[in-house]
Amino acid sequence: MKKVKLNDENIHKGYLILINPDNLLKTNEIKLISYSEKYKNIELDQVANSQLQKALKSINANDEIVPISGVRTFEEQKRLYTDSIIENGEEYTKKFVALPNASEHQTGLAIDLALNKPNIDFICPSFPYNGICQEFRKIAPNFGFIERYKDEKKNITKIAKEEWHFRFVGYPHSKIITNKDLCLEEYIEYL
């Protein structure tokens, strides 16, 4: 494996940008592209989208896995948070919905995916640990994606387990994070 030296300046931007309540988004300069013709309203960073398409094609996912949420503006994240408090309560919302400028969705590097079925839950879509979803989970690191929020890391990430939420960090970072069973916060410290 090729070694790459990163300094602090390079760690906290680009594909390794860490966005959470302790590291709020400051700027939002990203090149977005629609996920697909069918899902024009869901946008991602161009490279992340390309890698996601390749990953799904590699397992012949077709329409079995569908995108639920890509990039969100500050206003969209604020509305989602506020609406969730009204509909689901504060405790639930704090577990599953990030505050505005604390959401990775504002970077264009995060995607929520779901098993394609009727009545998909927008906040907690079904993405089980079997079948085509598990196949995606296994190959995702080869294409630069990590499963971002795991149950055993919630004390670090401050977000409950979200098996549907994938974050593009690029390769080889995705492989290292997965192989060492780290969350992004731990990986940034590791670097």
What is each PLM-predicted segment?
Residues 1-191:
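Extracytoplasmic cell-surface/polysaccharide-interacting catalytic and binding patches
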